[in-house]
């Protein structure tokens, strides 16, 4: 996940950085630092952010080389 994907997904969900941090179980400065490009996250924190976002039906999109290319909305798990 890139900082741009994180910001876009959070915006689509209408979440503040504080809300994403709460849902992911990470510190607010972790989200802020990552989204601003000033902080490289450890894999566990990226995974936590990604789980929180994907649980709400956002898919992170990558090309065949693994490069981030965007996000897409899908129904949350159990949704219609």
Mark where each language-model region is.
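Helix-turn-helix/homeodomain-like alpha-helical modules used for DNA recognition
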Residues: 58-80
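Short basic helix-loop element that most often maps to the first helix and adjoining turn
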Residues: 4-19, 75-79
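Short, conserved glycine- and acidic-residue-centered signature motifs
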Residues: 13, 42-45
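Non-catalytic, surface-exposed connector residues within folded enzymatic/regulatory domains
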Residues: 40-43, 65
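Recognition helix of helix-turn-helix/homeodomain-like DNA-binding domains
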Residues: 26-41
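Residues in the recognition helix of alpha-helical DNA-binding motifs
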Residues: 9, 23, 34
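DNA major-groove recognition helix of helix-turn-helix/homeodomain DNA-binding modules
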Residues: 25, 45-60
